[in-house]
Amino acid sequence: MSETIRLTPQAALSRLVPHVLEIESQAGGRRIAIGLAGGPGSGKSTLSAELVTMLNAVKPGSAALVPMDGFHMKHARIEELGLVERKGAPHTFEGAASVSFLHHLKHANEAVSGPGYSRKIEDTVDDAFTVAPEVKVLVVEGNYLLLTEGLWAGVKALLDY
């Protein structure tokens, strides 16, 4: 029988930060990707941003947040497909593009900009964030990072933890 451990977000982060730093130290200088997945409103964006802040407090400039919300299909495309009522479901994202982007980001030696999602306009925006070349830890957050079927399936294989 397994025991359930309940932790506050801060307690979870205090355990996670040393673990991530250990993984990064064993990566031989290559970028690593740490995934935080969860449903809408679960706190993954807040937790991910705090993880990046804490990692950068220990090793300045070492971590960057990579939100996957920018891989929603453009709203016009969702309307065209008649999927507005299903917006946010896995098939209303550009899953293959997210896999391609994350693969490129893990191997890039230059600054890379990524798309974001604006709640203000309810659509994606280009160049919402930039990952600097010196970043070694990508904190990837999104709803569907752990899916094993469909276009998102390739993301899980790119995550180191």
Question: Could you say what each language-model-derived stretch is?
Answer:
Residues M1-A33:
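Extreme N-terminal, non-catalytic leader segments
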Residues G38:
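The Walker A (P-loop) glycine that initiates the GxxxxGKT/S ATP-binding motif of P-loop NTPases
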Residues G41:
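Walker A (P-loop) phosphate-binding loop of P-loop NTPases
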Residues K44:
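Conserved lysine of the Walker
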Residues L47:
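Hydrophobic positions on the alpha1 helix immediately C-terminal to the Walker A/P-loop
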Residues T53-A64:
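Post-Walker A helix-loop "phosphate-sensing" segment adjacent to the P-loop in P-loop NTPases
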Residues A64-P67, M73-I121:
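Conserved nucleotide-sensing/catalytic segment adjacent to the nucleotide-binding pocket
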Residues T124-Y161:
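ATP-dependent NMP and nucleoside kinases share a basic, alpha-helical "lid"
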